[in-house]
């Protein structure tokens, strides 16, 4: 019992215990306030246990320097007051940094549904816009006050502990007892850092790793088991390789066949193919105008035509009956900048930290927009096109583009994202009316209203906010009434855009392409097939409508990807083109049989990749390990059905890995001279 009277032992154990209690409390806050999981979720308690072991590891790492300073034989926290003040300063800084990471992590998860990782660094590139969006969306002052108060409270508690232990009279402890306590302490610290005590291989002890939290196969449950500070560190320390040329060569024959490469060359890794003017081009005296309308943060789960029961999108629903309506359209990766990239370049942005738009070496991409010869080209955005450096991609890739952004508009700015979508459409109409009638144009309109802070502008042409309850909207996928009304506003503005186009005289000879850039955070989507929520497909599954007065309405059930847009529209418009990117004209037969679309299901340093068809999803780790096949029509979609469908499993396994590795190469190979 004499050993338990040790001042240093009591201080070390007590300090680690206090910090561990803080981290455990923050984990409870995450589970209750942010995870969105009911407390009876399968595997939740086991995952919490993993998370608490990560918390103990972090607590030990934070306090280890002070424990060492207390344990030194002569100059230590007991004998040197200056050293004690230095230790207190360290505690203030360390706890403040940890607290800040947790705050950012909570916001990051609430916004994107992903724990903080190295990809968060991309927001630092647009710090001013990110800061303004946070300021307009969250109670920053209250959050800051709570953060500082929590840091002050825990530092005060640790200082009190210090006085209650280190300032006590020195007990008499024998040398052997002291040595035994020291040895036990070292072993305990090592076990805490290791994170496990069962099933240890003493010759090769494997520590608890972030991947252990994903044992359930459910990313939402796994998020409960991660420690944001440790996970951020894990993702930052891994080098970001650009591409694996060996893997590209290994899968080249299958991918060249998939793309329909005219002259396959495994040595040069040639992906180029050419398409002539097709007989199915739309008839007209001159080539049609093309209008791309990117629908900010709009997933299929929010659209009535895809099953949303609250009728939030009557205009898009009506258009769906008058257009090519795509039931299974996917963006390859979530994130607006990544969607802009793929929609222009035709190459999925599979970078693992920053967005491809932020790499100055690759922003000058080949794009099929340049195949629309004789067209005036416009890109219109209500805010600042410097956001995520997309202006570099637009200006360097699209020849002769006229880029209009926040500084060019006369309309008032409504929030951090610039002018309203309706004002963007109205001012854009004036620009498009000015194009000579005998000259076609290509216009890319990027909307932003369906985004936090979900501003409803005062000048909105009669839009009315719906009087619905939080329970109603949460039962249909929205997380708040504000989010639901933002979707309604976006749809209302699309209806106004079509009226504006008809009044402006540029509707009749135009192809309109409406597509979502990614889904936003959802609550629950019982109106969708279970696979979309349980397999994480709801993030990538977005609406797509292709509308033209001369285009016969059609429902397309096959899986189609974002990279397919430009080749498909070029075929409709009668444009011959040369393509070395990933997309394909969907009116051409798919060489692989049932169409396959490559996906990134979970971003970050260790992404999970997938290949999706109309009926199946194959998912695997980024290195090809742990492949599983899932039936999208099943009521239990997490079940691996690879044994029931061995041929499809084999086909998709090669295509999924090959398409992902080829896309990584194409980011660099598609650069223009």
Question: What kind of region is each of these model predictions?
Answer:
Residues 1-242:
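Transmembrane and membrane-interface helices of multi-pass
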Residues 262-673:
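Solvent-exposed soluble domains appended to multi-pass membrane proteins
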Residues 39, 125-126, 227, 241-243, ...:
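Short coil/turn linker and secondary-structure boundary residues
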Residues 218, 225, 233-276:
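The feature marks either
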